[in-house]
């Protein structure tokens, strides 16, 4: 049995693992991929480093490997809590005394013609990172959930216009205060068109929308599914945690994008550090009680 199992091998999860391991805890990291960070072409707002998201993620993983923290490239399918935690993946079962949910936000890439072609050429995955590049221009957000609204709100502060492209979905609801700032377009998308950069969106009814930038914001935090099933509090599609990054379930922590707030590498690393140090205290206190 591990002291802590960390679900997610992004900045939050790796950060927490470094603290846990150096404090003498047995830790296991489980993660299927690097998530949205892998798609970031260049990150220029992280302290001391200008590199691609993938390069930053790989540096963190190397740190964990140097400390001999085991990392399993597996998909978690269920988490059960009964005094201790049982984590089932598509390959194995593991047990731990504490769990950190740090899978970030599962940003789904829709199968739309042109989306791969224009990645980094007008198609982005982070409004806070790249929004300033589109000051006073027409932009769009591709998505239909809370994350899409979050990105649209960020862009509304700098862009000339912001359109949420739901790609045929009609379940998105805006607060009254946002209806004057954000346009909802529920048409199904046929393809993205451009030359060296993206220029327009073509819909299946052959109408077009001139656009200078598109921000992909499909999906919600995958950690939420596990948190909800375990009975953790959820608010606005984010896991509710206290200042210790702990949920209302003893031993269950969450850090990074799945807790909401500023969705940045720097905050994910910080939350992971807090979670890691608090998990250390949790494990030590429980040992003393026994």
Residue ranges and their predicted role:
Residues 1-5, 71-137, 213-215, 239-247:
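FAD-binding core/adjacent interface of flavoenzyme oxidoreductases
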Residues 2-55, 63, 137-171:
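Beta1-alpha1 glycine-rich phosphate/pyrophosphate-binding loop at the start
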Residues 16, 39, 110-112, 135, ...:
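Short glycine-/acidic-enriched loop or helix-start segments at secondary-structure transitions
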Residues 58-59, 64-88, 94-96, 157-239, ...:
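A Rossmann-like FAD-binding core segment of flavoenzymes
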């Amino acid at each position: 049995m591990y002291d802590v199992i960390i679900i997610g091998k992004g900045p939050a999860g790796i950060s927490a693992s470094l603290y846990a391991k150096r404090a003498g805890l047995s830790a296991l990291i489980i993660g299927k991929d690097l998530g949205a960070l892998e798609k970031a072409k260049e990150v220029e707002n992280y302290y001391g480093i200008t590199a691609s998201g993938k390069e930053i993620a790989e540096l963190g993983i190397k740190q964990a490997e140097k400390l001999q923290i085991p990392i399993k490239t597996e998909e978690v399918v269920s988490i059960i809590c009964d005094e201790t935690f049982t984590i089932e993946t598509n390959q194995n079962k593991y047990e731990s005394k504490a769990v950190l949910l740090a899978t970030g936000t599962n940003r789904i890439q829709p199968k739309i013609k042109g989306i791969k072609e224009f990645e980094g050429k007008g198609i982005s995955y982070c409004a806070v990172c790249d929004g300033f590049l589109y000051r006073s221009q027409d932009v769009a957000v591709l998505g239909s959930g809370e994350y899409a609204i979050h990105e649209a709100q960020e862009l509304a502060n700098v862009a000339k216009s912001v359109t949420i492209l739901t790609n045929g979905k009609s379940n998105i609801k805006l607060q009254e205060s946002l209806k004057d700032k954000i346009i909802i377009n529920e048409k199904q998308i046929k393809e993205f068109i451009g030359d060296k950069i993206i220029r327009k969106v073509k819909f299946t009814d052959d109408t077009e929308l001139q656009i200078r930038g598109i921000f992909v914001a499909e999906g919600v935090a995958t950690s939420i599914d596990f948190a909800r099933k375990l009975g953790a509090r959820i608010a606005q599609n984010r896991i509710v945690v206290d200042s210790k990054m702990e949920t209302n379930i003893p031993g269950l922590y969450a850090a990074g994008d799945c807790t909401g707030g500023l969705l940045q590498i720097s905050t994910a690393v910080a939350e992971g550090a807090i979670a890691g140090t608090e998990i250390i205290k949790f494990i030590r206190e429980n040992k003393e009680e026994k």
